[in-house]
Amino acid sequence: MEFTEQEKKVLADKYETFKEEIELAMIQNCIVECELYSLLAEIIRGTKSGKKISLRDVSVRRKTKLSMWLHGAAGFPDFVVLERKKSRDAAKYGCIEAKRPYDNMEITEQIEGHLNSYGKVIYTNGLIWKFYKVKEKPVKEFCLGCIDPDNQDSVIWEPVNNWYELMSFLEDWNWKS
């Protein structure tokens, strides 16, 4: 998806806010994983593809009779992506798994389990975004920045064009297929 100049200005402002929130979370709260949840939900729900799905935060779910349909082979992910239908039998389209920016982003048994259970996975630490489909290498990967090796409370950010590319990909990401 191509963005107009006006849309790019709005996206650039959102990128600045995103970067500031990541840095504040790193400094003020050691950027625990749950710090990313509200940022991720805002980003996903703000896209064209995000308006077509139901994004449910299941990060603190426990196994109950009612919640078992959301439980996968690797437990509960952070978010489950469902059909946008007011029903407990809404189709499962995928999931999102977040990690701290300091964490390794290699594929793990947890991610493999989520892929087997949900089909599509967005795996992100806020700085690196990886998009997976069942049994495939990342369909796409985006880098927004990396931890500064000289200052663990700081990020070396990539240019705003990387954000535009991520947002464009998210706009067109088809959860159903």
Predicted regions, residues:
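Charged, structured surface patches that assemble and position nucleic-acid processing machinery
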Residues: 125
